[in-house]
Amino acid sequence: ISGLTEPCEKRRGQRKYVRYQWPISNYMWHCDWSEYKQRWYCVFIDDRSRKIMADGVFGNATTKNALFLLYQAMLANEVCPVIILSDKGAQFYANKYDKSGEKGISVFEEELTGLGIEFWTSRRNHPQTNGKMEKWFDTMKKRKKKHLDETLQEFVKWYNEERIHHALEYKTPEEVYRENL
């Protein structure tokens, strides 16, 4: 039709949010660190079910502690994920480049490569990529304010076995995890 303007490709509307999750449990695990009350919390969470695979509270957020939890998760659940997704924190990702401009490889990345696990990272300043972790830490911190004496292990048990999730069709992470093995 003549006289009408053409749409400008550069001015497209905001992209619609799309929820993603792998169709089976143990394909991708998310991991991250968060500080709360001068302690560092590290968690590995299954992408499909949102089940906490391993958790720990430490004095410092280190690669060694993250690897300890990864091995703990694999041994306790007798499974090795295909992919690990994390942010670009120094515990996981080599943020330095050598003199030739090549990105270094972190101890965490080397260990995953040795185990045959792919390592994916979120974009910088884009917490939505690892949103399941961000949401989990938010839930933990809110609950800890109400349940002061609850240990991390008690919280994880409640989260995995009792707390239903809207995104999981009102099932618990444990139920969804068992369905999708």
Please provide the spans of the model-predicted regions:
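An active-site-proximal beta-strand-loop segment
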Residues: 26-53, 60-64
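Short, conserved catalytic/metal-binding motifs centered on acidic residues
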Residues: 32, 50, 84-87, 112, ...
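Active-site beta-loop-alpha junctions of metal-dependent nucleic acid enzymes
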Residues: 37, 55-83
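Short, solvent-exposed loop/turn segments at secondary-structure boundaries
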Residues: 56-58, 95-100
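RNase H-like two-metal-ion nuclease catalytic core shared by retroviral integrases
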Residues: 86-88, 98-141, 175-178
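Short, active-site-adjacent cap segments at secondary-structure transitions
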Residues: 90-93
